[in-house]
Amino acid sequence: MSKIAKFYDAIEEGRFRCKICNYIGKRGQQGSTYPQIKHMKRLHPNEFAEVDGSQPPQVTLNTTTPPTVLPVAPKVEKMELKADMLCQPSDEQLRFHNQTTNLITSFLRKCGLPANLVNNASFISVLRHLNPLVMIPSADVVNKFMDSHARDPFLSSTQPPCIICGNEVPGHRSIRVSDDDAAIFLTAAVLTDQKTIRQAKRDILSEYLTVCLRHSLHYYKAMHKTLGMSEQMENIEDLPDNAFHTGHSIFNKILKMRQTLDDRPLEEANEDEYRAHLKRWMTSHQPKVSKKRVQKTTIADELFQLANFANQSIPHEFFQHMLQDQEEHEAKRVKLEEPEFEEHFDEQPSTSSYMATATATATATPFPSKMTVLTLANGKKVTKAPSLPPSVLNSGKLVTWKVSRRTHGSTSSTPRASPSLPAEDHGFIPDADGPVSEILNFEDLFNSSLVDAQLSTTSEV
């Protein structure tokens, strides 16, 4: 047995592979090891010196001592030097070899196959058939690459690539599709000239059929446009037969490739089955229509704005419909400032003798003719009216308000007597005894022909 046999592997008849650089060469005739020895001398002189017992060439640095004469290699012929240069791979070849090793390692790792599969004669024959110049890595190199894949999170990703874009970035949003759906996706890609039929046949052979979510809506619309149909799904049955001929043919060609891969019997889908597959695919991947928000309208939205409501009136039809639908409720009691009060009932409307200036004229206002006067313990008077519907009280219109006033000079502790007001007149009586600091006059708050609006007022004394 040759001394250098430990540096080589016999991969097939008439060929050997160097364990150091993975170089593959032809063996010598009749079991001669001359090609292996020649390769070791030229490319691995140190390893060859270990088994041969000779000293490898050494390089010394210039020192103060006289220079020593280095051993000179024997002169080689020109043809041998040229052959030696051809044996050394270039940088581009090394990059290609590393990429091949990486792909083989990924294939073995994802399929759960052992690393020594690279020594299998059938596996080597397949790779040699695809590329006669391929440099097949050894099992040790594959194991090293597998370890690096396990440490690298990007290389260790088992995310299957998309059959449309080939995206295999970890964590990209994708969906797993069936064989029929994948064939329809690829059919749409072929019909829109984004893939050739050969590329579609190759993509259907993926182990896991996944599609990125961002392709779903795009190819759904593309299939609509290709078939010449509108956005409604109901008219797919009304399309002519010639609209499905091209897609039907491409669909069967792509699906046959998948059936061949899975060792299934080759079955072609007829036109009715293709239409059923297509309709189900378009329905399952149809985008959902977003629900628009519907704002609820309230009573306050139906009424006018309250910014300048003094000269506005409530619509007649609106309140007529509102009053017919709602029952009469009890009036809301006016919230008193003090809990202790004395009730005093007066059948006359409550007005102040100094609530208007001398030049003001009485105007018709919708105040009720009869009001209940409440006299508090501290001398304040509160007037309130009978019931109004809660919808009117909460409709955004002013129902209860307060009039602030002040007088010049001292005021008596007892309130002034209120003069009587005729029943047919519902306005303020002007009086020149006391000036008015502020007066609020609200006209036409309600239509008197519709309802006798009854409002409550609160005044400070």
UniProtKB/Swiss-Prot annotation:
Region described as Disordered: 404-423
Molecular function (Gene Ontology), one example: zinc ion binding
InterPro entries with a match to the protein in the record: Znf_BED (IPR003656)
Zn finger region (BED-type): 1-51
UniProt-recorded name of the protein: Uncharacterized protein ZK673.4
Annotated Zn(2+) binding sites: C18, C21, H39, H44
Keyword Zinc-finger among record annotations: yes
This protein's UniProt keywords: Metal-binding, Zinc, Zinc-finger
Species the sequence originates in: Caenorhabditis elegans
Pfam families reported in the protein's UniProt record: Lin-15B (PF25375)
Source taxon at top rank: Eukaryota
